Amino acid sequence: MAVKEILRMGNPQLRKVSNVVDDASDELIISLIKDLQDTVKAHQGAGLAAPQIGVPLRVVLFGGGGPNPRYPEAPSIPQTLLINPVLTPIGSDLEDGWEGCLSVPGLRGKVSRWSRIHYRALNEDGFEVEHCLEGFPARVIQHECDHLDGVLFPDRLVDSASFGFTGELETAGIIEKLSSAEQKASQQSRAD
């Protein structure tokens, strides 16, 4: 149980399809869940998938219960851990939105995602859960589940012109800058 190194784009492990978890109560899974929680908190991510810390298993964690400094305009999402998630789009509506990724540091891009999604998975206690999400939470779960299939958000860009360094996109006014209060909160969280 520790903050793990996050693999970055270019590492071939990020391109592999992850294995199904056979036993959610296995000690390896319990330890993995704690590592995901510690790592996503330390890096202020909106979510994290097991392959991003070098574990090729179908486990994702998203949300954190409070505002996320990396996505200040987004609603808070309760922390949710899913094992072997299966996603099904609800309807045919797609929504374009800006994404970043802890495995693609410093870069953002516009990606089209289903606006509403239904998921079915096991929770950390091994019980089957299902839920419907829309908007930003639906985007986050789709992004994290892509990691389970070896897909990174740049693979899904609306167009290559929407992909760039966060600072450059902010300077050009393409995406909003973090407010000074949000920057301060972000810096304080990093110091903790």
UniProtKB/Swiss-Prot annotation:
| Keyword annotations from UniProtKB, A to Z | Hydrolase, Iron, Metal-binding, Protein biosynthesis
User: Where are the membrane-spanning stretches?
Assistant: none
CC cofactor note: Binds 1 Fe(2+) ion.
Report which reactions are catalysed by this protein. N-terminal N-formyl-L-methionyl-[peptide] + H2O = N-terminal L-methionyl-[peptide] + formate
Output the Pfam families linked to this UniProt entry: Pep_deformylase
One GO term under biological process is: translation
* Signal sequence, renumbered to the chain: none
Record-linked Gene3D superfamilies: Peptide deformylase
Q: Single GO molecular-function term?
A: metal ion binding
Q: Binding of Fe cation: at which residues?
A: C101, H143, H147
Q: Does the keyword Transit peptide apply?
A: no
- Quote the catalytic residue positions: E144
SUPFAM superfamilies in UniProt: Peptide deformylase
Question: Which superkingdom heads the taxonomic lineage of this protein's source?
Answer: Bacteria
The cofactor(s) it depends on are: Fe(2+)
Q: Known EC number(s)?
A: 3.5.1.88
- NCBIfam families recorded: PRK00150.1-3
Role summary: Removes the formyl group from the N-terminal Met of newly synthesized proteins. Requires at least a dipeptide for an efficient rate of reaction. N-terminal L-methionine is a prerequisite for activity but the enzyme has broad specificity at other positions.
Identify its protein family.
Belongs to the polypeptide deformylase family.
Q: What is this protein called?
A: Peptide deformylase 1
Originating species:
Prochlorococcus marinus (strain MIT 9313)
- This chain is encoded by the gene named def1
